[in-house]
């Protein structure tokens, strides 16, 4: 049997690199080769791929998903695309949204076009979207059929790319599968996001900035469980379908902060309440019945254990995050 040649965009980032390390690691499918296409923005980190760099099944192409000619050339040699590349930080999209629209919308459309028009035939396209496309929900959980009501420029750019991806299925018959996951956590997470920011601040004895009263609720998904869900959809999902992927642990930011204070042996003295994020969604909650029933998805990582492991990883890998924090002035 020949290997499936998978093109992973954004594979030098947090989730994409974990996906690549897993695919090429001992628990991977074994019958794949992986090419990462990544622009190496501030969030892309070559060190995230150190574990696989010498693997003969791995290759890396530096470049922008908006570069039509490059994308067509790279896509030509692949059988599947798994698309993570994006501008991903909500706060940055509030400061300036242009890059979000360019990369997340135009970049996705460039890839879809290359997937559709590939010499030798179209290739399946797994689009990694987010639960933020649904907006905010006070009670209950969103099934995949709920309308999209994104609030931040980031979420709106992801909703746009999500819909453009599905349009390539409905219009052209391209095999497009969309996943909408909740908030990921784990190692190698860029230290501007809440969990790694709080852990690294606490490790340094600094205060952590909690938005407003910390009442915003998020569902937390460990990266191992996210990869499990993505692989189920890549290998067994149906073309044209959307699959929610959640972790099953809903916490307010205040509850999350409490757990991180405990892990670091700190108190609420270390917390600074800061002005709330503009347009801050109150609660996200995805209904994962579809992926559970159709593909047998089961999140396995206990949140308390996963958070402790994540805390320990940052404690033990200062050399990974310290330069990133200094460079980004976090
Ligand atoms: P990240 O910011 O850590 O990584 C993004 C990667 O994309 C980086 O390696 C960056 O260099 C690359 N990139 C950015 N612009 C590019 C371009 N124009 N061309 C090529 N590469 C480019 O993001 P992440 O947290 O790993 O998220 C991955 C995907 O998952 C994103 O699509 C994001 O919207 C989605 N997602 C993330 C979360 C989460 O909790 N982190 C939750 C839901 C959905």
Predicted region positions:
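Active-site loop immediately N-terminal to the catalytic Tyr-X3-Lys motif
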Residues: 97, 179, 191-192, 237
């Amino acid at each position: 049997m020949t290997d499936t040649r998978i093109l992973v965009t954004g594979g030098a980032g947090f989730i994409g690199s974990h996906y690549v390390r897993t695919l090429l690691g001992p628990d991977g499918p074994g019958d794949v080769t992986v090419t990462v296409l990544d622009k190496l923005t501030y969030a892309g980190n070559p060190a995230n791929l150190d574990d696989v760099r010498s693997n003969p099944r791995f290759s890396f192409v530096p470049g922008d998903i908006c570069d039509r000619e490059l994308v067509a050339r790279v896509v030509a040699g692949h059988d599947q695309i798994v698309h993570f590349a994006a501008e991903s930080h909500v706060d940055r999209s509030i400061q300036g949204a242009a890059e979000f629209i360019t990369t997340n919308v135009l970049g996705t459309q460039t890839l879809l076009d290359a997937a559709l028009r590939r010499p030798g035939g179209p290739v399946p396209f797994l689009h990694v979207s987010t639960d933020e496309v649904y907006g905010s929900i006070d009670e209950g959980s969103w099934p995949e059929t709920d309308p999209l009501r994104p609030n931040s420029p980031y979420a709106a750019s992801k909703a746009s790319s999500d819909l453009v991806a599905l349009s390539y299925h409905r219009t052209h018959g391209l095999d497009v599968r969309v996943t909408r996951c909740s908030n990921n956590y784990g190692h190698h997470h860029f230290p501007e996001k809440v969990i790694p920011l709080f852990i690294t601040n606490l490790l340094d004895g600094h205060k952590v900035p909690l938005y407003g009263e910390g009442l915003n609720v998020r569902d937390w998904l460990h990266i191992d469980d996210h990869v499990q869900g993505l692989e189920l959809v890549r290998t067994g999902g149906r073309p044209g379908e959307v699959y929610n992927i959640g972790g099953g642990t809903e916490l307010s930011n205040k509850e999350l902060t409490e757990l991180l204070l405990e892990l670091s042996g700190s108190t609420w003295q270390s917390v600074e309440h800061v002005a709330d994020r503009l347009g801050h969604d109150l609660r996200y909650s995805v209904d994962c019945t579809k992926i559970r029933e159709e593909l047998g998805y089961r999140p396995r990582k206990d949140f308390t254990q996963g958070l402790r492991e994540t805390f320990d990883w940052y404690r033990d890998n200062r050399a990974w995050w310290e330069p990133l924090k200094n460079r980004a002035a976090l």
